[in-house]
Amino acid sequence: TDNGTDRSLSYPFGDETRNGMKAWAIDAGTHAPLLVSCPGTIPEGTQSDDLVDFSDFLPTIADIAGAEMPDVKLDGRSFWPQCQGKEGDPRKWIYQYYYPKFTEAGQPHGEGINGNEIAWAQNQNFKLYRDGTMYAVSDRGEKSPIVKNGAGERGETARAMLQKAIDSMPVWAAKLAYGD
């Protein structure tokens, strides 16, 4: 998504006007609609709220083309069935990593414009940062963190799943010198 629309721009979204939040890790900086068109194959008006990750594009394009995938482990999965209005194999979570610049940020996440590694996993309802801070996805501005054991059974189950996802990813501790 190139981390959102420029901050100087506003745009209509449903019944509200939203501001661009480029370089923020909140929903307005990372959430982008995916539009797919294939007249005669994709039923008009088909919509899906399934999560799609960039790694899903290779298997999806291969699926559309009927190409054989190499016998290698891929992180992505085809979302072509969902495009056709079928159930498919939707993701349970997505992982995002963002390291925008080479200086330290003033905040651990949210405003990442000045640097700072920001990593999180999210599902349809919850978003968990690597530092353990959790938000409801519906809290688009991330104003109300959910304390540990404060999300109810469904939320704490999601927290455990999302933490496992984060733990499965590498930690990028080495920083590059600017200009290298």
Spans of model-derived segments:
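Ligand-binding/active-site lining segments
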Residues: 28
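C-terminal cap/loop subdomain of S1 sulfatases and analogous C-terminal strand-loop tails that border
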Residues: 5-20, 24-25, 42-46, 50, ...
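Bilobed periplasmic-binding protein-like "clamshell/Venus-flytrap" ligand-binding domains
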Residues: 165-179
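Surface-exposed loop/edge segments in extracytoplasmic proteins
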Residues: 141-147
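Catalytic cores of eukaryotic secretory-pathway lumenal/extracellular enzymes that build
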Residues: 31-32
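Short beta-strand-to-turn element immediately C-terminal to the catalytic PLP-Schiff-base lysine
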Residues: 35-37
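Active-site neighborhood of phospho(di)ester-bond hydrolases with catalytic His/Asp-centered motifs
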Residues: 1
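Short amphipathic alpha-helical coiled-coil/interface segments
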Residues: 158-166
